[in-house]
């Protein structure tokens, strides 16, 4: 079960692992859903009480390794809401314990106006060690979809196009 004390990103529902292991094939619409924790920052102290929903797409290889993209919900009550993109990138790199690099795009202009701002995050796994750790995390944390995630995930999954800022090989239509 997900607990309040968990800190590392936790993936909770898998539809397909194939896109994560076959980096030479463009994303074909299959995805893995789950949640990721983004800790809040109050002065220098971390308050680990914020879960956010995420969609991870297996994509083509980037020059730096296997590449994944994710949408993360950022509520307006969270400290990073509305921050400069570069500041967010630096903050996440320092405080969020994930393997690989993180890059933020501008908010994705979510169509439903009452939904929180969403950011696109790219994971660049640079070695088999990171990839294996990532897959192990997925395989050991598969759970039923959590309450409240489905509607948001379905809304984001309907988006037809976006440009991934972290991989030059992508085009606007890689992710469908």
Please provide the spans of the model-predicted regions.
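Polybasic, proline/glycine-rich intrinsically disordered low-complexity segments
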Residues: 41-46, 51, 79-161
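Charged, compositionally biased non-catalytic regions
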Residues: 1-35
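Cys/His-rich microdomains that often coordinate metals
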Residues: 171-172
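Cys/His-coordinated zinc-binding microdomains
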Residues: 168
